[in-house]
């Protein structure tokens, strides 16, 4: 068997990626989230496949087909709630994974980092088109509001929006194409994840110390396969608790009302996962400015390798940048909270302050703290 896994053309790839892969001996549980994201993706593809067997992407029957899945299909309610809450768990793991990358300086592996940003954007797009499918009030109005943002693009905006809608409003054509996108995108994510892994294995994993770990590597199996399995077990436990005890905790009650183009909900809040980006969008009064800020809030992650001037790798022994990092995380949580609040006096102001802080911390404060720490080292 040992010879087979090292010589067989297919098994050799698996062997180099998951069995004999040289891995730093000191990577902590923060490194588990990559495998957890893989597990989430598999759960989403499997539950999604079973949902797609019973779902109909037609405006007249979409809402009732989801109700039919929950009421009449064997364990349909479980599959539906695992899929909906699985998406939330996916994003929680994704945010922690990116946060770990920033904290430990994993952005130094620029190819892996950039593919990661593309994966992040693709996942957000998948979640958005998926949110439209149940065809409830929030699905319909969320689709209308978010697709309408493209009309802010000069000259081609209005044409582009109508092209995406397939008509003059969000209707049957929109729902059908969104279902098609929602079906194909997870497979594109899976392919991109393989490219992400390919680039990672070219350089090897980073580690908490930020030092070169070539002198102290251990095989991935059995050490990290067991560690990853424990992480996956805990993830499944959390997902089951969420899906069985609090299935609607992260959803919106408005989505239990069928879509009605004549009745607008009191306030349109996106899915909990994209709330921070939505808060940044809303904090700018100008439409085009808001759209640009929304896109930049994600793309700004690509500046981390460029703006990093520190002589040390990661934040493990950098107290100034560590403090700024945790302020940044707190700021992100504030933005997430604001994204789900109505557009009223205290919330709009808090949102604007938090949005300015978000960009200021990344573009100004972090590079500044790098310079300060470099000068302290010289003393």
Curated annotation (Swiss-Prot):
It is a multi-pass membrane protein. InterPro entries: Cyt_b/b6_C, Cyt_b/b6_C_sf, Cyt_b/b6_N, Cytb/b6-like_sf, Cytochrome_b, Cytochrome_b_C_euk/bac, Cytochrome_b_N_euk/bac, Di-haem_cyt_TM. Binds 2 heme b groups non-covalently. The chain crosses the membrane at residues 33-53, 77-98, 113-133, 178-198, 226-246, 288-308, 320-340, 347-367. Pfam families: Cytochrom_B_C (PF00032), Cytochrome_B (PF00033). The keyword Electron transport applies. A ubiquinone binds at residue 201. Heme b b566 binds at residues 97, 196. Heme b b562 binds at residues 83, 182. Keywords: Electron transport, Heme, Iron, Membrane, Metal-binding, Mitochondrion, Mitochondrion inner membrane, Respiratory chain, Transmembrane, Transmembrane helix, Transport, Ubiquinone. Its main location: mitochondrion. The keyword Electron transport applies. GO terms for molecular function: metal ion binding; ubiquinol-cytochrome-c reductase activity. GO terms for biological process: mitochondrial electron transport, ubiquinol to cytochrome c. GO terms for cellular component: mitochondrial inner membrane; respiratory chain complex III. Its cofactor is heme b. It is found in: Mitochondrion inner membrane. PANTHER family: CYTOCHROME B. Belongs to the cytochrome b family. Component of the ubiquinol-cytochrome c reductase complex (complex III or cytochrome b-c1 complex) that is part of the mitochondrial respiratory chain. The b-c1 complex mediates electron transfer from ubiquinol to cytochrome c. Contributes to the generation of a proton gradient across the mitochondrial membrane that is then used for ATP synthesis. The cytochrome bc1 complex contains 11 subunits: 3 respiratory subunits (MT-CYB, CYC1 and UQCRFS1), 2 core proteins (UQCRC1 and UQCRC2) and 6 low-molecular weight proteins (UQCRH/QCR6, UQCRB/QCR7, UQCRQ/QCR8, UQCR10/QCR9, UQCR11/QCR10 and a cleavage product of UQCRFS1). This cytochrome bc1 complex then forms a dimer. This is Cytochrome b. The gene is MT-CYB.
């Amino acid at each position: 068997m040992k010879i087979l896994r090292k010589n067989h053309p297919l098994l050799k790839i698996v062997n180099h990626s998951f069995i004999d892969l040289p891995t730093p001996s000191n990577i902590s549980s923060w490194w588990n989230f990559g495998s957890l994201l893989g597990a989430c993706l598999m759960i989403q593809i499997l539950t999604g496949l079973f949902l797609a067997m019973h779902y109909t992407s037609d405006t007249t029957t979409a809402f009732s087909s989801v109700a039919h899945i929950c009421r009449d299909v064997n364990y349909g309610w479980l599959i539906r709630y695992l899929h909906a809450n699985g998406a939330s768990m996916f994003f929680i793991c994704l945010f922690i994974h990116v946060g770990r990358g920033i904290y430990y300086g994993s952005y130094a592996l620029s190819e892996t980092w950039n593919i990661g940003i593309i994966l992040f954007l693709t996942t957000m797009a998948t979640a958005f088109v998926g949110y439209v499918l149940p065809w409830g009030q929030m699905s319909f109005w969320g689709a209308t509001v978010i697709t309408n943002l493209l009309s802010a693009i000069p000259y081609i905006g209005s044409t582009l929006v109508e092209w995406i809608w397939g008509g003059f409003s969000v209707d049957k054509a929109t729902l059908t194409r969104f279902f098609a996108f929602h079906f194909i995108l997870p497979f594109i994510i899976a392919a991109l994840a393989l490219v992400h892994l390919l680039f990672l294995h070219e350089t090897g994993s980073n580690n908490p110390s930020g030092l070169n770990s070539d002198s102290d590597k251990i095989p991935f199996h059995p050490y990290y396969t067991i560690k990853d399995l424990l992480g996956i077990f805990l993830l499944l436990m959390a997902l089951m608790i969420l899906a069985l005890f609090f299935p609607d905790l992260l959803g919106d009650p408005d989505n239990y009302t069928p879509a009605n183009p004549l009745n607008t909900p009191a306030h349109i809040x996106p899915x909990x996962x994209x709330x921070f980006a939505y808060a940044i969008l809303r904090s700018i009064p100008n439409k085009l400015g808001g759209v640009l800020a929304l896109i930049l809030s994600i793309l700004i992650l690509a500046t981390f390798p460029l703006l990093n001037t520190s002589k040390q790798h990661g934040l493990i022994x950098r107290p100034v940048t560590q403090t700024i990092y945790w302020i940044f995380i707190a700021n992100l949580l504030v933005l997430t909270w604001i994204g789900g609040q109505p557009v009223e006096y205290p919330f709009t102001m808090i949102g604007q302050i938090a949005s300015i802080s978000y960009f200021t911390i990344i573009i100004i404060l972090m590079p500044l703290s790098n310079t300060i720490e470099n000068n302290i080292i010289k003393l």
